[in-house]
Amino acid sequence: MGKKRAPQKGKTVTKPQEIIVDESKLNWKPVDIPDTLDDFGGFYGLEEIDGVDVKVVDGKVTFVTKKDSKVLKDSNKEKVGDDQESVENESGSDSESELLEFKNLDDIKEGELSAASYSSSDEDEQGNIESSKLTDPSEDVDEDVDEDVLKENVFNKDINIDDISPVNLPEWTNLAPLSMTILQSLQNLNFLRPTEIQKKSIPVIMQGVDVMGKASTGSGKTLAYGIPIVEKLISNFSQKNKKPISLIFTPTRELAHQVTDHLKKICEPVLAKSQYSILSLTGGLSIQKQQRLLKYDNSGQIVIATPGRFLELLEKDNTLIKRFSKVNTLILDEADRLLQDGHFDEFEKIIKHLLVERRKNRENSEGSSKIWQTLIFSATFSIDLFDKLSSSRQVKDRRFKNNEDELNAVIQHLMSKIHFNSKPVIIDTNPESKVSSQIKESLIECPPLERDLYCYYFLTMFPGTTLIFCNAIDSVKKLTVYLNNLGIPAFQIHSSMTQKNRLKSLERFKQQSAKQKTINHSNPDSVQLSTVLIASDVAARGLDIPGVQHVIHYHLPRSTDIYIHRSGRTARAGSEGVSAMICSPQESMGPLRKLRKTLATKNSVSTDLNSRSTNRKPIKWQNTVPLLPIETDILSQLRERSRLAGELADHEIASNSLRKDDNWLKKAADELGIDVDSDEDDISKSNSDTFLLKNKNKKMQKTINKDKVKAMRATLNELLSVPIRKDRRQKYLTGGLVNLADNLVKKRGHNSIIGHEKTNALETLKKKKKRNN
């Protein structure tokens, strides 16, 4: 068998105090939740462990424990415990290693081999197997450190070609020299060809010039500027001293998170080892966590932020000013909103901080006089939107011959606010139409106090994924409760909600919408329900919610640009959608008239296909939007349901508000040591609290006693169980123009209305347009 090797003399084995362990090898214990705890906030299935320390290095969490293996699973004790103890006896370890050395590989048990190669698995995978001696524990720690170093250079090693599917995107490859990472991601996301704004923007942006892009909603503006900056991120990944690549500013938090998600999807392989390279910094979330993430290596190379939170971070840490002053690209998404009141002051301070620091760096290094590349994108660029910012009346008195002259005026105004390297290149993919041609607009005329009823009618007649916009937060809250009382899944999002609750509500809406689509696809004969998201204008800009079929304007928007962005939540990525306005007669003579006149293009003309006359007359604003047909017999059957649901919604909201007011008053009184009951009479007599008393009395009038609430709910449930019938037909199912018996047997017709054909809002408007033509 050969001679035994003599043990090496003079060699001392150091016993490490700690070892790094994988979390899957730890003996986790489930956390017992007490029965008296009502709400655990969704944290179920938690596990805990003692005797383990947690260390975070560059965002990577590692678990460290001492050499006793009590915290390890039984399968790992043999591996870590016994083998490491045997290292203390050199002769014992040598003899065991020799036995393993001269064994046939077929005779070696799986446990022995794993124990022998526990700390050198990486070397075995490369085929460089050294002697099968048990490795010294001190070498375990050193090799773990070496592994981390290798992971940082993961992009320098060879790529397994078998893991990459062939890319066949000729339109993308002909557009610009894009990396394989981006092309692979575009193919996986099924973005097979670029949109119009992407075709015109990406090559120009990659040349480093300033760009001002205008395109309709849902046209792919995010990737138009996102692909070039992600290309820079990929090309700079191997550099050690990485400078920030891009700053992207958005007007809303939701839009910032959405842009972050879109950029991460097209560079997932890059983020696998540096997950914080693309970072979202918005309000409503922990600023301490954001400060900690910015300190990680290679983090924040692309930052998507709202101006308020980013300014707060800069003012708290001056090193961030120096760091982000070296940025290469500055991007303004939805720039028209960013430069309006409320955002521009913060944005101007940010630009001032960065420019001052950049000039200092340029003077010290004698670098180029060129500042960052500036990219501006929006769906609406109109000079009217900048009137509040301008102190000159010359802008208001201007009249423009065409759209290009108006955009040039906007650029002149922007150049006084934003620092460009030169006059930006204008890329306008919809010079004439302001609303996307894929959106079919419609008008619903209703009495001013019956908006809820007509909204319920639309959702019953045209079920689907619907987004409803309201001007007031109180309307959002009431409409949500109202629709839930009628059995329609409704979710809400508005500015009074915390950021966490906003994101949670959006996620629930998407899940419910996907669930309903799955049910309808698997069982087309099932009753189709509408899935509704009710929102204030906080969700009007930029949000890409997949599958929204209808947008309802519960109130007319306050400005034209808000209407354009609201309507743009449907008809995304080339699909079609419906935008319906609920309008009272009083609104039609004022706000509606102004809205339609502003939206009317200069080239809007009547198109008569049979007439060859060149004298075409402009279309009147009244004829630019068709009326949605309303069937009064169905509406009358919904009226009583709507009344009961509305009263119950008012009661629920008023009761919750009164309860919150009482709890707040009692809490404040306890903190001040005041007896609330003794002071109630004095408060009621005080003239200074007249407004509070009126508000309280108004809420009290909307409340209903418990017995009446139960009776109303029972009546409402009974009405909801009765199917709606077209023309109120209840007898002679085989008579009339439509054979109801035949439709019921063959499961044809509307799923919610007996005797009615299947309806689709989009097809209804298309048919009406054809009849009018």
Curated annotation (Swiss-Prot):
SUPFAM superfamilies in the cross-refs: P-loop containing nucleoside triphosphate hydrolases
Where is the organism placed in the taxonomic lineage, from the top? Answer: Eukaryota, Fungi, Dikarya, Ascomycota, Saccharomycotina
- Domain Helicase ATP-binding: residue ranges: 202-399
* Domain Helicase C-terminal as annotated: residue spans: 452-615
What this chain does, per the entry, is described as:
ATP-binding RNA helicase involved in the biogenesis of 60S ribosomal subunits and is required for the normal formation of 25S and 5.8S rRNAs. Required for the maintenance of dsRNA killer plasmid.
Instruction: Tell me which UniProt keywords the record has, alphabetically.
Output: ATP-binding, Helicase, Hydrolase, Nucleotide-binding, Nucleus, Phosphoprotein, Ribosome biogenesis, RNA-binding, rRNA processing
UniProt name for this protein: ATP-dependent RNA helicase MAK5
Enzyme category, top tier: hydrolase
The miscellaneous remark of the record is: Present with 981 molecules/cell in log phase SD medium.
Asked whether the UniProt record includes Nucleotide-binding among its keywords, one would answer yes
- Location within or outside the cell: Nucleus, Nucleolus
Family the entry assigns? Belongs to the DEAD box helicase family. DDX24/MAK5 subfamily.
Gene Ontology cellular component list: nucleolus
Q: Which residue intervals make up region (Disordered)?
A: 73-99, 114-144
The UniProt catalytic activity note for this protein reads: ATP + H2O = ADP + phosphate + H(+)
Please give the chief subcellular localization of this protein.
Answer: nucleus
